[in-house]
Amino acid sequence: MIKLGAKELRTIKPQKGELKKIKKHPIYIILDNVLDTYNVGAIFRLGDAVAAEKVILCGQTETPPHTRIKKASINTTEWVQWEYFADTKSAIDHLRLTIDHLQIIAIEQSSKAVPYDKADYSFPVALVVGHETDGVSKEVLKIADQIVEIPMWGVNKSLNVMVSLGIVLFEVMKAARFK
């Protein structure tokens, strides 16, 4: 395994030919009013890690270029495709019009949620994560095809938005690989 130091991580700059060789997965990561810029940057890193098609920033979510997003993303904002929409419902409506058979999955604690490891995942998929305090908006939960949640056994009943997304993203990759 290769271990890179902080300086090396922050100075990685892939060549255009290198980027074209990467097979993108039909995964769209939607941020529904995620406020913490470090979460936004870390989500760009997750998008890069799974070769997601696009990160979609909505509402009050800050957009690149932003110093803290860039730092947390270790420059992945430079090559991970992203788009901004004023509201999340408009983003989802746009994606549904342009991508056939798109599955919208909200990651949220809800009485309608199924455990993330029991959900039915297929490509193309859009994963929606929400505001750090308020979660995914009710409007988005109503139009999601599925709501998934991560079981919690301790005293604390919530995880950081980026951590939750990472867990579900890798479950999506695992599940989709076998279809």
Where are the language model's segments positioned?
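Post-transcriptional modification and biogenesis factors for structured RNAs
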Residues: M1-K179
